[in-house]
Amino acid sequence: MDYKQALKYYPDFPIKGVNFVDIIPFLQDKALFRSLVDDIAAVCASPNIVAPEARGFLFTAPMLYSGQAENVIPVRKKGKLPFSEGDLVTVEIQKEYGKDQVFYRLSDLASCKPVGDIIPLTFFDDILATGGTARGIVESLNGKTVTIDGKQYPVKVTDYVFLVEIDDLPGRRNIEDLAPVTSLIHVTEN
């Protein structure tokens, strides 16, 4: 299916010089959305998905319902994720339009399904532009170890999956040293 036709573009949003790729039209067509979620699930190498808010949630949560994923680990903006002492991990990221912080919980990682001797994760996000968000989160996750049923498991992001990759931006080059990259739709910025 040619998903590219469903995308909408907004120049100079959210700031001048950034061209926004809008994926919301996928939510307005049930058959298209279902097909897209199935295609995303088919390329995810892990049963555990890590997804930054909020659009990443839109495409990964249905995978839980359908049994195509075991767990979705949310990565949230500041003030959006309740936590216990020592549970919250802060990640510094470089976005296309500035620096930011995002957060995830170690307890969410401990709810993942181990495969062999690791906790494998697929990183999913809607857009790959510069790769700053993806790189920051994956570098942080790959350094973690969680205990499940008394056994320690290292966390390893096995792959990146993106709905849309902007091919003329350096995103892929900036992250592919950490894990293989799959993108369902390829566009150019201009």
Residue ranges and their predicted role:
Residues 1-45, 102-110:
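Active-site-facing substrate-recognition patch
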Residues 5-6, 139-190:
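PRPP-dependent phosphoribosyltransferase catalytic core
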Residues 46-54:
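Short glycine-rich phosphate-binding loop at a beta-alpha junction
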Residues 47-48, 120-122, 159:
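Structural motif
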Residues 56-60, 168-169:
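Short, well-ordered alpha-helical microsegments
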Residues 58-67, 137-139:
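Short Gly/Thr/Asp-enriched flexible loops that form oxyanion-binding sites at enzyme active sites
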Residues 70-122:
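Short, glycine/charge-rich flexible loops or terminal/linker lids adjacent to PRPP-binding catalytic cores
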Residues 125-138:
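Acidic, divalent-metal-coordinating active-site segment for phosphoryl/phosphodiester hydrolysis
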